[in-house]
Design a protein with these regions (language model features):
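Canonical Rossmann dinucleotide-binding motif of NAD(H)/NADP(H)-dependent dehydrogenases/reductases
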Residues: 3-35
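Conserved glycine-rich Rossmann-like NAD(P)H-binding loop of the short-chain dehydrogenase/reductase
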Residues: 30-46
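Conserved residues in the N-terminal Rossmann fold of short-chain dehydrogenase/reductase
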Residues: 36, 61-62
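A glycine-rich helix->loop->beta "capping" turn
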Residues: 54-57, 77-90, 96
Length: 101
């Protein structure tokens, strides 16, 4: 039986932990090829390893969504590794260094 997202390519920011990790694992379980992102390499690689262990395809793209070159590099990873892009989940967040009033 074909999975719902078979062959689709998904980018997920902030997917090394928490909700982003859960989204990455779910999309992969539905057949999507996943590009995992996190600021830290270890959590991102753990998610990639979990997806691969379950028979899915995934790669990591480490970096901050606030970096000027990030979007191009993130999308470039999807295109070079999986030949396309179908789904983007913007799960990453950031905070200001000051109190917001």
């Amino acid at each position: 039986m074909t999975k719902k997202l078979e062959g689709k390519v998904a980018l997920i920011t902030g997917s090394g932990r928490g909700i982003g990790r859960s989204i990455a694992l779910k999309l992969a379980s539905e057949g999507a090829h996943v590009v995992v992102n996190d600021l830290d390499e270890a959590p991102a690689q753990e998610v990639v390893a979990a997806i691969r262990a379950a028979g899915g395809q995934a790669v990591a793209c480490i970096g901050s969504v606030t970096a000027p070159d990030f979007a191009e590099r993130f999308i470039g990873t999807a295109v070079s590794e999986f030949k396309g892009l179908d789904i983007i989940v913007n799960n990453a967040g950031y905070t200001w260094d000051n109190v917001v009033q």
